């Protein structure tokens, strides 16, 4: 009888733990420490709190969202846990920042892209390495990966110590047009998410990567509030459409403009 009571109590504890664990995330889990070597965190010198993500695309350049620009910005590379510092964690400051049309002018749904040149290049290491730019645009239905230190609660600002990752799908742009009023008929953005909801990027993930088949296809831009609602997928700046601009800037053509 005592054994039965003990087993029953253990079962209750296990169920309670499972319920609490499921409530801690917006459809994702802690990223594997080796899967995000290109993921960077943006913060300001004063706040010390990550406000955005970014993507290392070579040893000297980081891709992020225009909405993530701040004064006195800092870029943290090689980070996993905010409580345990990896030996190869590095911090950089921008040497130059570039925006579409040579200015930080973007609408809520367009031209949300920023290219940061680091003041000092970084070297590849155990936890730092760039990711490839896209060779082709992503196909509909493709499963892609999002990641970041953004909030893990849809109702309150609860930021994790480690980056969280989730798989989402590339959706037809018409799905996002149906979800959000005033979206233009065409846009250089990707629509991605889970129609049933429950998996989504959220506050603090902006600027981070949408990774598809080992290439950065999107930049986290914006989405529904609260995060993770059914039929409210996220909008991601389409990197493929900005390839010529990105490559021109990196090659030294500072007057390059984004596609219309």
Curated annotation (Swiss-Prot):
GO cellular component, one term: secretory granule
Covalent S-S links between cysteines: 31-165, 52-68, 100-258, 144-212, 176-191, 202-227
Stretches assigned to the Peptidase S1 domain: 25-251
GO BP annotations listed: proteolysis
Glycosites: 83, 123-124
Expression by tissue: Expressed by the venom gland.
First and last residue of the signal peptide: 1-18
Keyword list, A-Z: Disulfide bond, Glycoprotein, Hemostasis impairing toxin, Secreted, Serine protease homolog, Signal, Toxin
Superkingdom of the organism of origin: Eukaryota
Propeptide feature ranges: 19-24
Location(s) in or outside the cell: Secreted
GO molecular-function terms, A-Z: serine-type endopeptidase activity; toxin activity
Pfam families registered for this protein in UniProt: Trypsin
Function summary: Snake venom serine protease homolog that may act in the hemostasis system of the prey.
Family according to the record: Belongs to the peptidase S1 family. Snake venom subfamily.
Record-linked PANTHER family: KALLIKREIN-1, KALLIKREIN-RELATED
Protein name listed in UniProt: Snake venom serine protease homolog KN7
Species, as recorded: Trimeresurus stejnegeri (Chinese green tree viper)
